[in-house]
Amino acid sequence: ESDYNQTYQDMGDILTECYSGETEAGETFIYAANDDGTFCSVLVIDQDDNYVSFVGEGTFDEENGTVTITDEVSEMALTFGVAVNDDDTLTLDMGDLGSATVEEATLAVAVQGLKYAVENGTEMN
């Protein structure tokens, strides 16, 4: 547990932005990143506490307006389009996987979300 606590502390020190909201299916969706995108995380938790996480380097494709996060452990990647809405929320479009509407949140949301998922959830990826 102390290793995880250090990880959460490190995340809090690294992250500079966090967005939280819901997918179309009602799942919790949390996106967080540091200034230059070298560390990004996406966490999706469903109503049954099953979760999928992507933690690793993020790249932004300006031409297509997409962000891709490649998970450091699984090497799986998640790509989503980013659209800014009139009410300052963001819509993250993941194609066949659906979309999520998120708003700016405190960094604690990202850290607490990951902590909750690790301690209570079932990893799905």
Over which residues does each language-model region extend?
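A structural detector for short beta-strand units
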Residues: 25-31, 54-58, 76-81, 97-103
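Long, low-complexity, Gly/Thr
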Residues: 61, 86-87
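N-terminal glycine/threonine-rich, aromatic-flanked beta-hairpin/loop signature
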Residues: 10-66
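Tryptophan-anchored aromatic micro-motifs
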Residues: 1-29, 112-125
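Acidic/charged, solvent-exposed loop-and-adjacent secondary-structure segments enriched in E/D, K/R, S/T
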Residues: 102, 106-113
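Generic detection of short hydrophobic beta-strand segments and adjacent strand-loop junctions
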Residues: 6, 21, 56, 67, ...
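An anionic, turn-rich surface loop/hairpin at beta-sheet edges
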Residues: 65-84
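Short, exposed beta-strand-loop hairpins at the edges of beta-sheets
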Residues: 90-95
